[in-house]
Regions:
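Beta-strand-rich recognition/accessory modules
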Residues: 31, 182-214, 287-354, 527-665, ...
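Beta-strand-rich N-terminal accessory domains
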Residues: 27-97, 199-239, 247-251, 320-403
Length: 749
């Protein structure tokens, strides 16, 4: 394929702060619907038998097979033998008239150089690189060159690329397809030819190896008058550039797009969006993959950070042309700290496996997730309080807070005390932000006894970190246990805050507060009932003297917003256990866990747990919080590092919205289905912070306007549901503490 370069000079629209217009004049919705992805337009990547290396697991998988789902097809690839599980395959080098077949890859000797490396993984694009390939001839003699294999997948394309230095001849074969050459050979297994043309004011090139158009964002430094991590003068910055897609053919096609940037990007928090020329969000998804990791003392690796790669697969109808604006939202959106959720590559850090990073604003991480639980056997990893200064005396605003991380979803140890790892953990990126993220995870226990689904959402806000968690566990086979938890705040090997007090309660107030015992690997209390509506748990009372560098002075907790469970064949309420660990002499931690009720010793097929939790984090030192929310500042001045902030959140956001038009699907975060006239009207009392409000069931993304107490809301997020073929819009509405909110979504057409 010829390497082509296309550039189109248009007026540069960078650093526009204009909101999407309240009166929308975009193209016809039927036309836009034809450009939206279908249910089959996706990719996923997962370890079939679970991650090969999970910290402190005695039951590693016997196979190291990856599953790559692309569109309606799958590839099972054995990463040990470096070959597909089935079918005809050849990966060989020919040097000095000897043929060497690939026999596998090198062993893992150092986590930094882990040879199976995930570069990008998301909704539209997967890239895995296997380094340190081993080759041998028929007599067992080894090839002494260095080679790597790259696997890439789009929904409509699968390709392998073999790279090796020197003059050796390279060969790849899959089925009836074969390629040969030197240096680098590309074997495309499935590839729907694209007739899409891409034009932009930005440089556009075609990447033959990746099968997509690359669109390079400007590499231009930002000003930073105060020398802060995120430049204060750019808090409300939004960048926009024009992109045009065209298809002159008589048949539909797909435009595969890759937006790239390496430098001068606030990499910890941003959201790319494809919008109409007037700034109206279209709902066309853009995958967010990025990396900031480097460890020069260990060496430099291909694909180490920093970089951002944004991927889109846009259907382009025949004989059509459409103008878009590619928009980058950074720290704030409409004056509210924006939410984002991205795949973060670990190449340059180590382990090189799956990692997700979510942020409110662009001031460092807010909460991270490690599908596979590789490094510290915890799914919930780094967690940081929002807009909270670290303890250093010269700390500045708009930068990284310290870490209060650690937590997990399902934890099961069998009757012999052996940790049961999870397998087939896969990620479904439904929305990257900037008003409300939506990412789902699915996995199951190694023997298929329990199927687990977890959904995490991060809302934009200006007060404190909230994370909405929705859990669903279905029992498929009988299980017994020495230890079973449906959720952990503070994991066994990741629990950064030495908090000394635990409290439980409900909407009415405090139920009980106590100081857990200081012990090692044993329970303090077991199966304490969480009674009453809006039950909550607070972990506070930070022992400052035990804080180490980088650990946050923060209190944490969670609210049980909804709970349904059948355990042992009977309806079961939530219960709490507190589990003690010790990280070195006298360095004690307490994990709080949701567990089965007392007396239940076995789960049977048909048992389940379904829960909605709200995880909250607060600064434990009032003076450290520098955010703009006056109500939170007053609360922390009185009650920081106590149970009261968690109770306030539980009661203050126990919303009871009433719908005059449309249907309430969920009270908090509020989800409203519009009526047949594409209209909704809802009233509610109170609330705290900014309330995420989502309207679903829209037949078009434009022609709507939200009135909040009669005033139009000017910033929103649009998402497309490919299963229902409908749009939804999400707003962040400032709460009326003690007051009333009237919300009306108007159909302006």
């Amino acid at each position: 394929m010829k390497h082509t370069v296309m550039t189109h000079s248009l007026t540069l629209l960078t650093t526009l702060l204009l909101a999407p217009l309240a009166a929308l004049h975009a193209a016809d919705s039927g036309t836009l619907a034809a450009w939206m992805p279908r249910a089959e337009d996706g990719t996923q990547l997962w370890w079939v038998e679970g991650s090969p290396q999970v910290f402190n697991s005695q039951l590693p998988p016997t196979e190291e097979t990856l599953c790559v789902r692309y569109g309606g097809d799958k590839l099972l690839f054995d990463t040990k033998r470096v070959r597909p599980v089935d079918g005809v395959w050849a990966c060989a080098v020919v040097a000095e008239e000897r043929r060497y077949e690939c026999t596998g890859r090198g062993a893992v000797k150092d986590e930094f150089f882990q040879p199976v490396r995930f570069v990008e993984s998301g909704r539209f694009f997967q890239r895995v690189i296997i380094e340190d390939l081993k080759f041998a001839d028929v007599e067992g003699r080894e090839f002494n060159g260095r080679a790597r294999l790259e696997i890439t997948a789009w929904p409509d394309r699968l390709a392998f690329r073999l790279e090796c230095g020197g003059e050796a001849k390279l060969e790849l074969r899959r089925g009836e397809k074969t390629v040969a050459g030197t240096k680098s050979v590309l074997l495309e297994i499935a590839n729907q030819p694209s007739t899409a043309a891409v034009e932009s004011e930005l440089p556009v090139t075609f990447d033959e190896a990746l099968g997509c158009h690359r669109i390079a964002l400007p590499e231009k430094p930002w000003s930073n008058a105060s020398g802060t991590y995120y430049p204060e003068e750019h808090l409300d910055r939004v960048d926009r550039w024009r992109v045009t897609l065209r298809n002159d053919a008589d048949t539909p096609t797909v435009a595969r797009l890759m937006f790239t940037q390496q430098k001068h990007l606030p990499i910890t928090g941003f959201t790319p969006m494809l919008c109409e020329p007037d700034g109206t969000p279209t709902g066309l998804p853009v995958q967010v993959s990025k990396n900031w990791h480097q460890r020069p003392e260990k060496g430099h690796l291909q694909h180490e950070g920093p970089w951002f790669h944004g991927f889109a697969a846009v259907r382009v109808p025949p004989k059509s042309k459409r103008d878009f604006v590619f928009q980058m939202v950074y720290a704030r959106y409409g004056g509210v700290c924006a939410a984002s959720h991205a795949q973060l590559s670990l190449i340059g850090w180590g382990h090189n496996q799956f990692w997700d990073q979510a942020a409110v604003g662009s001031f460092g991480e807010s909460i991270c997730f490690e599908p596979g639980r590789v490094q510290r056997r915890s799914f919930i990893t780094d967690v940081r309080p929002l807009m909270t200064l670290p303890r250093q005396p010269d700390a500045k605003r708009w930068g990284w807070a310290e870490n209060c991380g650690g937590g997990d979803f399902l934890l099961w140890k069998d009757t012999a005390g052996r940790y049961q790892p999870m397998k087939a953990t896969r990620t479904d990126y439904r929305s990257h932000g900037p008003c409300l993220t939506d990412v789902g995870y699915r996995e199951e226990t190694s023997g298929g006894e329990i199927a687990a689904r977890m959904q995490v959402s991060l809302p934009a806000t200006n007060d404190h970190l909230r994370t909405f968690l929705r859990l669903r566990y279905d029992v498929r086979k009988p299980i017994r246990w020495q230890r079973l938890a449906f959720f952990q705040l503070g994991a066994d090997f990741y629990n950064d805050v030495p908090a000394r007090r635990v409290a439980i309660g409900n909407l009415t107030g405090l139920g009980e507060e106590w100081e857990p015992r200081r012990a090692k690997d044993e329970y303090d209390r077991q199966a304490v009932p969480l009674a009453g509506a809006g039950s909550w748990v607070s972990v506070h009372g930070v022992e400052r003297a035990m804080l180490q560098k980088g650990q946050a002075t923060a209190s944490r907790g969670f609210v049980v917003r909804t709970w349904r469970a059948v355990l042992g064949g009977k309806a079961a309420a939530p219960h709490l256990s507190t589990y003690c660990t010790e990280w070195g002499k006298d360095n004690h931690r307490t994990a709080v866990e949701l567990v089965p009720p007392p007396g239940i010793t076995e789960l049977q097929p048909g048992d389940f747990v379904e829960a909605e939790l709200e995880l909250v984090v607060f600064a434990a030192d009032a003076a450290a919080y520098y955010g703009p929310d006056a109500a939170l500042r007053d609360l922390l001045a009185r009650d920081a590092d106590t149970w009261r902030p968690v109770h306030r959140e539980a009661a203050g956001n126990a919303l009871q919205p009433q719908a005059q038009r449309g249907t309430i699907e969920k009270p908090y975060p509020l989800v409203v289905a519009v009526d047949d006239q594409q209209h909704a009207r809802v009233s509610l009392q109170g609330g705290l912070g900014h309330l995420p409000v989502t309207f679903i069931g829209l037949t078009r993304p434009q022609g709507h306007r939200l009135l909040v107490n009669g005033k139009p809301a000017e910033h929103w997020q649009t998402d497309w549901n490919s299963a229902t073929q409908r749009w939804q819009v999400t707003y962040n509405v400032a709460s009326a503490i003690g007051g009333r909110l009237e919300l009306e979504l108007e159909n302006t057409r």
